[in-house]
């Protein structure tokens, strides 16, 4: 494996996504059930419109406007809309982008994961963890 190989060679292809109409507790359940740290958000046509990180979920309970929520997801479901907590229009990779290019973005932007998109559809996700596994395997 070379740094000039495409990210498609290291990306995870079984990507769990949520749509913008999922409620807060459904998103929490996806994070918990799948042990994930990043959840791509799609519109009704399956096009990527945002991403929610585990940090975004934790920030909900520290924001003054959500202070009264405590850990009550029934109330949170009524008050919090996923588009309000997601990062809209996230930086993405193409399956043809190089591993080196992905590593550069991770370093510059301090991201931990990026969706891989082809023709507007999510085809994978690449994480810093994927790069660490690659380095460990080949060093």
Question: Model-found features: residue ranges?
Answer:
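Tandem CBS (Bateman) regulatory domains
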Residues: 1-14, 54-91, 98-99, 103-107, ...
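Short, flexible active-site loop motifs that bind/organize anionic cofactors or intermediates
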Residues: 14-17, 47, 92, 121-122
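A glycine-centered beta-loop-beta connector
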Residues: 31, 39-56, 106, 114-130
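Residue-level signal for alpha-helical context at structural boundaries
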Residues: 25, 45, 49, 75-76, ...
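The conserved cystathionine-beta-synthase
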Residues: 18-35, 42, 83-86, 92-110, ...
């Amino acid at each position: 494996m070379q740094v000039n190989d495409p990210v498609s060679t290291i990306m995870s292809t079984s990507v769990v996504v949520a749509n913008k109409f999922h409620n807060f507790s459904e998103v929490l359940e996806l994070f918990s059930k799948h042990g994930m740290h990043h959840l791509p958000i799609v519109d009704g046509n399956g096009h990527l419109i945002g991403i929610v990180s585990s940090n975004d979920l934790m920030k909900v309970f520290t924001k003054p406007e959500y202070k009264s929520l405590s850990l009550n997801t029934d109330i949170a479901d009524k008050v919090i809309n996923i588009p309000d907590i997601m990062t809209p229009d996230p930086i993405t990779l193409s399956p043809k982008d190089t591993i080196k290019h992905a590593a550069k973005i991770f370093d510059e932007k301090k991201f931990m994961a990026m969706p891989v998109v082809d023709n507007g559809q999510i085809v994978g996700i690449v994480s810093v963890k994927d790069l660490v596994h690659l380095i460990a395997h080949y060093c």
